[in-house]
Amino acid sequence: MPPIHRLVNYVDVPSRSPNTVVEIRSRDADRTREEILRAAMAEFAGHGFGGARMGAIAERSGVDKKLIYYYFAGKDELFLAVLEQTYADIRAAERELHLEASGPLEAIRSLVAFTWQHYVKHPEFLHLLNSENLHRARHLKRSTRIREMNSPLVQTLGDILERGRRDAVFRGGIDPVQLYI
């Protein structure tokens, strides 16, 4: 019988290799980080950045408040991580639309319909954006990750608008960023 290793969360796991404990701890760390992010999303969406409390996030996530500071340097970094995850989710869903394969008008209609439905299904997204807008996008401005996520969408929109201009469906000079906003 393989040896048993006692882990931080007191689960006995048979060990097949020396890396087993590290892998399990890594999965536990990932799960803990995800729980903190989920709790933080709910807290920030419900109370805004200014009203959200780290203690409430700790309580919602079921972890000690000190553990939140192990994963995130502070409230600003946690809020930014929530924003980045939220943007990653919507950008991944938008990629599934395959807008580049549709005609210009249909692509824009699909994006508008999708965006509206996403906002309806995920009202926390709008609450987070409203909170960030109140702070003049101070967190978004610091995020290279969000800029990198937005760039392909802006490029795709620009291509769609150009195809639409060539097909005389759209007028020229439409800024893809302003259109999306």
Q: What residue ranges belong to the model's regions?
A:
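N-terminal intrinsically disordered/low-complexity leader segments
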Residues: 1-31, 42
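Generic hydrophobic, amphipathic alpha-helix propensity
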Residues: 32-40, 57, 82-86, 90, ...
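Helix-turn-helix
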Residues: 35, 43-77, 81
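Short coil/turn segments at alpha/beta junctions that flank glycine-rich nucleotide-binding fingerprints
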Residues: 46-50, 100-101, 122, 167
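Short helix-capping/turn signature of helix-turn-helix
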Residues: 72, 131-137
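Hydrophobic/aromatic residues within well-ordered alpha-helical segments
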Residues: 75, 82, 86, 90, ...
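Hydrophobic alpha-helical connector segments
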Residues: 95-127, 147-150, 154, 176-180
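Hydrophobic alpha-helical bundle segments that form small-molecule/ligand-binding pockets
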Residues: 140, 150-179
